């Protein structure tokens, strides 16, 4: 299981492991391979309390899946979901692209 996290300015974290706990984090030379763009730029900032819209785009090469030697997705079935987590914000919120089919999803 690979977990790729990204904030609104394109800072990424990649982890791999069978469960949520004790995942191995990708080294910096691996995460540096992810191309990223953010409409908010790349400079960190404090929480913005006014209404803000933003976009982020990532290009994730096969090499980011650093525990496997993936060179093609031909003939493979993969699954993914996208989440937006604002658990540490003034107004906590959570969104997902696809439905989460468990009663109480955990976003931490």
Model-identified regions with their sequence ranges:
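Structural preference for beta-rich elements and adjacent junctions enriched in aromatics
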Residues: 1-108
């Amino acid at each position: 299981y690979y977990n790729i996290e990204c904030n609104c300015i394109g800072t990424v974290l990649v982890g791999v492991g069978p469960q949520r706990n004790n995942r191995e984090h990708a080294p910096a030379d691996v995460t540096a391979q992810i191309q990223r763009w953010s409409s908010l730029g790349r400079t960190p900032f404090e929480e913005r309390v006014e209404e803000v819209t933003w976009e982020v785009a990532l290009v994730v090469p096969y090499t980011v899946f650093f525990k496997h030697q993936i060179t093609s997705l031909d003939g493979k079935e993969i699954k993914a979901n996208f989440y937006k987590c604002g658990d540490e914000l003034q107004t906590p919120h959570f969104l997902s692209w696809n439905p989460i089919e468990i009663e109480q999803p955990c976003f931490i």
